[in-house]
Amino acid sequence: MDVIGNITDLSPTVSGIPDECGLEPHDFLEVKFFLISVVGTLIGLFGLFGNATTALILTRPSMRNPNNLFLTALAVFDSCLLITAFFIYAMEYIIEYTAAFDLYVAWLTYLRFAFALSHISQTGSVYITVAVTIERYLAVCHPKSSKNMCGPGGAAWTILGVTTFAVVFNCTKFFELQVTVNPSCPDGSNWQSYILLPSAMASNPIYQQVYSLWVTNFVMVFFPFLTLLLFNAIIAYTIRQSLEKYDFHNQKSVVAALSASVNLPRNIAGISSRNELKEKSREATLVLVIIVFIFLGCNFWGFVLTLLERIMGQETLMVEHHIFYTFSREAINFLAIINSSINFVIYLLFGKDFRKELVVVYGCGIRGISLRLPVQDKFVIWRHWKRTKSRISMNTTNRTRHKISLPQTLVEHANLERLEETRFLAHHEDGVQTQVSPIHALRNGSTPKIDTLQDLTSNGRPCKTSIIDDNGTVVCTVTEFP
């Protein structure tokens, strides 16, 4: 977002006659007013609410971790960006649309500071996104290094470093704008009495060529864009490979727990705890990938327009492609507002723990309206791409194959105490047979020996055996193949 290139043209026409002290609004003012001042403001208000809620939830004791600390800082920078965007761009079109001169004078008074704060917020938002991407990259691809480098202290120092860099890098922005008095309209009561112009420093050719052109475009456009694209491509590929292996490793852990002869519930509880930690890490990574790809999508057109400005020249675009260039710049501002407002929606849709904490913070209902928030993980389809339920396959002999199907509650709750006495029900098209078998038959890695089942499977058809507890609840299912 560039204020200098968006300065109001203060040379209006009245009844077709130029008025050197009057106001001439922007071209397509009605469209810009509706897009930025109306729709953009509504989206920004929602974004401020969402970012405040995000910061409130992610700082709760149960949600505190290095990744959420980065996301909290991102919410703060995005909120500052939304506030400055309103007071710079939305307010400018409101002033022109309503012809409020007093508001225009106030706008000129604070514009220089809002302009610098806008760039500081934008730089902080970009590099917090880069920092959390690198943190997730280390957690996914180099977990051992991540434990040593990405603790809470490291995250806090990184955020402090990003904030310091954002302030230092943009400190000259405080001096790029100046308001001068127009000698042709010196009374101070006309629109042209005060003129907003680039300062002498901003007009310096060396400053423009080195800082404004090459350094700013590299630091704010090319480097973060390419870095995010590269790291998130690696993360996305690693996640895809991890999800394909997720079922196998999870099933292997359950088999190991079932094979233990002592402390079976404790073993499965330990496996469940480890799986839960891995699940939370995987969810955090997937949420970040979505945030970054939306960030890249919202900033892609700004990346393209910057390339066009460097190749064709800004003056050429303004003169020969005036409509295209004008609306492209407004689209960039509008997409920046969307990008700073949408993270809350991503957390709400894809963050299971975030939804739980949201219900705790705001309660189950607001003025009688029940909040029906989804409770299932939105990425379940990724993990169950090739299956419909958790299954464990193992071979016991060369002639007979067994498949044990376990419900998810077996791993999550580790409630196996009631399995010491179970009933094996053999289901078959020819009839049903029942036989009692203890749980230790599963602990040694073998399936229960039931003579009647061998007769039933001799005709070449599989036989399904269900393990049920005293309450009649099916705990697991053994499918025997001939």
Curated annotation (Swiss-Prot):
**Cellular compartments per GO CC:** G protein-coupled receptor heterodimeric complex; Golgi apparatus; non-motile cilium; plasma membrane
Subcellular location(s): the record lists: Cell membrane; Cell projection, Cilium; Golgi apparatus
Q: Which cysteines are joined by disulfide bonds?
A: none
Q: Outline which residue ranges sit on the Cytoplasmic face.
A: 54-68, 135-148, 240-284, 352-482
PROSITE patterns registered for this protein in UniProt: G_PROTEIN_RECEP_F1_2 (PS50262)
* Membrane-topology descriptor: Multi-pass membrane protein
Superkingdom of this entry's organism? Eukaryota
**What one GO molecular function would you report for this record?**
protein heterodimerization activity
Asked if the Swiss-Prot or TrEMBL record annotates the protein with the keyword Nuclease, the reply is no
Q: What is the protein name for this chain? A: G-protein coupled receptor daf-37
Q: Which organism is it from?
A: Caenorhabditis elegans
